[in-house]
Amino acid sequence: MRTLWIMAVLQVGVEGHLMQFETLIMKVAGRSGVWYYGSYGCFCGAGGQGRPQDASDRCCFVHDCCYGKVNGCDPKKDFYTYSEENGAIVCGGDDPCKKEICECDKDAAICFRDNKDTYDNKYWFFPAKNCQEESEPC
């Protein structure tokens, strides 16, 4: 499943908000979301189950929970509006639902930046069979 997400993002002409998320991660965390988080731990990438393996994986868990609370638009496809002001990402636009998506993505990008030191290559392409513990609630 995670591989499908990576492939979807890497295809030429990809549209929708996943590319915006990648851009935010690059701007805020200074690294590629697709490369570093496209298939990391139990929650980064498509799907998610079990318990987060470290703080970086927890960023993805919280992001998944945030998306789960968005109603009225599609977090994986809809474009949102944001700007940069004094080095900070500011979510904008008239659509409150799309603004929520932006806030979810912004918070995840900040989380990735703040937890770079927890990133552990042993969780890159982590086997789903190691993510069988009961998930905690959002």
Swiss-Prot record:
Listed name of the protein: Acidic phospholipase A2 Ts-A1
Cofactor note: Binds 1 Ca(2+) ion.
List of residues binding Ca(2+): 43, 45, 47, 64
Disulfide bridge map: 42-131, 44-60, 59-111, 65-138, 66-104, 73-97, 91-102
Keywords in alphabetical order: Calcium, Disulfide bond, Hemostasis impairing toxin, Hydrolase, Lipid degradation, Lipid metabolism, Metal-binding, Platelet aggregation inhibiting toxin, Secreted, Signal, Toxin
Location of this chain's protein in the cell: Secreted
InterPro entries named among the record's database cross-references: PLipase_A2, PLipase_A2_Asp_AS, PLipase_A2_dom, PLipase_A2_dom_sf, PLipase_A2_His_AS
Broad EC category: hydrolase
Essential cofactor(s): Ca(2+)
Residues at the active site: 63, 105
Annotated EC: 3.1.1.4
GO terms under cellular component: extracellular region
GO MF term set: calcium ion binding; calcium-dependent phospholipase A2 activity; phospholipid binding; toxin activity
Pfam families named among the record's database cross-references: Phospholip_A2_1 (PF00068)
Signal peptide range: 1-16
Tissues and organs where the protein is expressed, per its UniProt entry: Expressed by the venom gland.
Family: Belongs to the phospholipase A2 family. Group II subfamily. D49 sub-subfamily.
Gene3D superfamilies associated with the record: Phospholipase A2 domain (1.20.90.10)
PANTHER family documented for this protein: PHOSPHOLIPASE A2 FAMILY MEMBER, PHOSPHOLIPASE A2, MEMBRANE ASSOCIATED
Reaction catalysis annotation: a 1,2-diacyl-sn-glycero-3-phosphocholine + H2O = a 1-acyl-sn-glycero-3-phosphocholine + a fatty acid + H(+)
Organism (species): Trimeresurus stejnegeri
Role, per record: Snake venom phospholipase A2 (PLA2) that shows a moderate inhibition of ADP-induced human platelet aggregation when tested on platelet rich plasma. Exhibits high hydrolytic activities and prefers the anionic micelles (dPPC with deoxycholate) to the zwitterionic micelles (dPPC with Triton X-100). PLA2 catalyzes the calcium-dependent hydrolysis of the 2-acyl groups in 3-sn-phosphoglycerides.
